[in-house]
Amino acid sequence: MAAMVVGALRRGTATAGGSSRSFARSLPRPVSTLVVAEHEGGFVKPSSLSALAAAEAIGKDDNRVSLLLGGSGPGLHKAAEHAASSHPLVSEVLVADSDVFAHPLAEPWAELLRSVQHKGGYSHVIASSTSFGKNLLPRAAALLDVSPVTDVTSISEPRVFVRPIYAGNALCTVRYTGEDPCMMSIRSTSFSPTEAMSEAKVAPITQVDLSFLSEGSSGKSAWVNLKSQDTERPDLANAPVVVTGGRGLKSAENFKVLEQLAEKLGAAVGATRAAVDAGFVPNELQVGQTGKIVAPELYMAFGVSGAIQHLAGMRDSKVIVAVNKDADAPIFQVADYGIVADLFEVLDELLKKLPDKK
């Protein structure tokens, strides 16, 4: 009888132990998020503020959010002050003050991200899907031995995300089942930045320990220079109005007419890959799957046929106006307003009717 009781107790203990392990596995993991931010002119870039909005979508109540900035000089510290009051969820701003991080080279930044992750133990790491984020995230993920989730457009649960596939023609829901951290890049056009807080709440600013840096930290790449257009027009990725030209404009000279319209509207100028490949405009103006992803309030397309790769980069625009003499052009399938006409006649009429921007 005693043996039966002891056996039952042993079986009960074993079952209870298994249940406790199962229960432990089912417990929700604590959420903490590291946002890798970019800055310019002493301010956090809008794309990084969108990454903060994505962090809020992961968890609002129990989410410890740290924001990582790198670089050197007064601009970095001014940006850190801006970051400290940029979002109510930001609990700490981490600053890596070194000339090594003054330029967006993936090798030293990946080492920095690995070091910060090892010390912070974050459950999530977020970067915006900019050229910098796309370059950094895979390398850092490889160093941390995890698989990144890219181009996230929506967050359903802390580890369930939606991302576009097939050039934006389908949406895929993915669940991250790997080890921490869950690393992801987000489309900034899909997450609206939160308005700046009052100065009443300011997160502390902490210097990152850079003792991990060595002479080989810069890797096999070196910064050469940065070339940018000298223009007063807004940045293409964040402009509220975008005027885009395609191969139908026929020449670089005709793109100047489009630029006149952009000046009247206070808009950014974009281009299709065909226009870029033809040499009409530089490639930094390319909108599409392999160019800039935009979602302005107003998107005007002149002489754009609507190739699938181009539509992937602008289909989230609030209002789309298309002008093309081909009534069967695919661009009309996504346009809110379509004009089947000669684009040069339409441009001429618009330039006559629209007042100059003050």
UniProtKB/Swiss-Prot annotation:
PROSITE patterns: ETF_ALPHA. It is found in: Mitochondrion matrix. Its cofactor is FAD. The keyword Cell membrane does not apply. GO terms for cellular component: mitochondrial matrix; mitochondrion. Heterodimer of an alpha and a beta subunit. Binds 1 FAD per dimer. Its main location: mitochondrion. One of its GO terms (molecular function) is electron transfer activity. PANTHER family: ELECTRON TRANSFER FLAVOPROTEIN ALPHA (PTHR43153), ELECTRON TRANSFER FLAVOPROTEIN SUBUNIT ALPHA, MITOCHONDRIAL (PTHR43153:SF1). Keywords: Electron transport, FAD, Flavoprotein, Mitochondrion, Transit peptide, Transport. It comes from Oryza sativa subsp. japonica. FAD binds at residues 298-326. One of its GO terms (biological process) is fatty acid beta-oxidation using acyl-CoA dehydrogenase. The keyword Mitochondrion applies. The electron transfer flavoprotein serves as a specific electron acceptor for several dehydrogenases, including five acyl-CoA dehydrogenases, glutaryl-CoA and sarcosine dehydrogenase. It transfers the electrons to the main mitochondrial respiratory chain via ETF-ubiquinone oxidoreductase (ETF dehydrogenase). This is Electron transfer flavoprotein subunit alpha, mitochondrial. Belongs to the ETF alpha-subunit/FixB family. SUPFAM superfamilies: Adenine nucleotide alpha hydrolases-like, DHS-like NAD/FAD-binding domain.
